[in-house]
């Protein structure tokens, strides 16, 4: 028995019940990719698809203007821009705890559960945005970076040459951290 799962001798993995599987970490990105594929199949060359905050931009707006999207400053109840990204045949997905959290005994907890512990993540990462050709991959990676936190997440993102933008809470407010791959895309290199 491993974490409520049984591995039978014939190599079948059985789950006898009691476990909930939540695919929301990739569902919106999956939907964005499916809509984009449909548009592509009909010869649409310029579009911006958005589902629940996950976006994919292809081509450009009228007059060759880029699809520009904002990464919000992670402050509950406030909508301010932290970073602007031009989506050039690229998707962006953001995960964070500044809107989705719960309170228990006067303490705020992230809605993101660390599968390694079974408890809400506990670190100072407020928001993470990932750029990728696939919205589903960006969506899943944003959640993974949220679980890993700023230090492990940055190391993983750099090792895998991912385009990731972290916003970390500090005693003085927030600090922006980004990978070289993110900087290259944002700076148009």
Residues of each region from the PLM?
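Mature catalytic core of soluble alpha/beta enzymes
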Residues: 3-189
């Amino acid at each position: 028995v491993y974490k409520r799962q049984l591995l039978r001798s014939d190599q079948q993995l059985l789950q006898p019940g009691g476990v909930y599987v939540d695919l929301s970490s990739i569902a919106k990105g999956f939907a964005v990719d499916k809509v984009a594929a449909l548009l592509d199949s009909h010869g649409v060359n310029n579009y911006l698809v958005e589902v629940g905050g996950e976006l994919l931009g292809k081509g450009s707006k009228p007059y060759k203007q880029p699809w520009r999207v904002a990464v919000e400053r992670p402050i509950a109840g406030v909508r301010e821009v932290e970073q602007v990204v031009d989506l050039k045949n690229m998707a962006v997905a953001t995960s964070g705890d500044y809107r989705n959290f719960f309170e228990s005994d006067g303490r705020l907890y992230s809605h993101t559960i660390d599968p390694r512990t079974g408890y809400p993540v506990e670190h100072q990462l407020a928001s993470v945005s990932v750029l990728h050709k696939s919205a589903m991959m960006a969506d899943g990676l944003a959640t993974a970076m949220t679980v890993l936190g700023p230090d492990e997440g940055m190391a993983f993102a750099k090792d895998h040459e991912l385009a990731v933008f972290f916003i970390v809470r500090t005693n003085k407010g927030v600090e922006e951290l980004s990978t070289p791959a993110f900087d290259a895309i944002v700076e148009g290199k």
